[in-house]
Amino acid sequence: MTTEEWYDGLTAELLSQSPFRRSDYFKRFASGTLTREQAWSHIAQHYLLIAWFPRIFSGIHTRCEDFEVRKDCARHLLVEDLGYFEGKVGGTPDHDELFRRIGDDLGYARDGYDRIVAVPEMAAIIAFFRRLAHEVPWSAALCATALLEEEVVEIAQTVGRALVQHYGVRKDWGAMNYTVHEAIEKEESGETKRTILKHLRTADDRRAAEAAMREMHRLLESYAESLARRHPA
């Protein structure tokens, strides 16, 4: 089995169990049976994830000697923090702004984002992000970020569509977060993967990468399950 076959197989396995499709909370989100307050519970927590995500690439950039990997990290930062898209900075709003627009449409004030407190399961994800940025071997850390970016497509296909269909979010405002992320994933498809595969050279590299990807998946599952417990049907 080649490294690419191994990577694609593991990614497919984990995506087939995506908590954003399988969890009771997200099934109810997709069907429109949550209240606005219950829907906001996820949006608010996911904002914390989005706010921390670029810092993984900042951390990897500072400790990686490989120039091509550092360029890939810099590209991610441009996309997340400066809206780089279709070859230009500002091609989209920055990702923090995109998330605040969801709150605009759901009736939550922008300054409220600064007071969001992480639930324990989201705090665990953020703690893992810190480890990815500063401790986990950077090739393994990039594999975990690539898995999370694949999950973004799942989120767009459930949460993004449901916000428009059921919760009064405008396509050209709050829902832009999801259409932009889908478009970015299509544009960037394969870039990070090509960078990663060059550096998964040994069995130990693959073991570290698999451990990081499975831990990312486990934490997302735990988060999704916690939403179902906090907001029972």
Predicted regions and their residues:
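Non-heme di-metal
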Residues: M1-A233
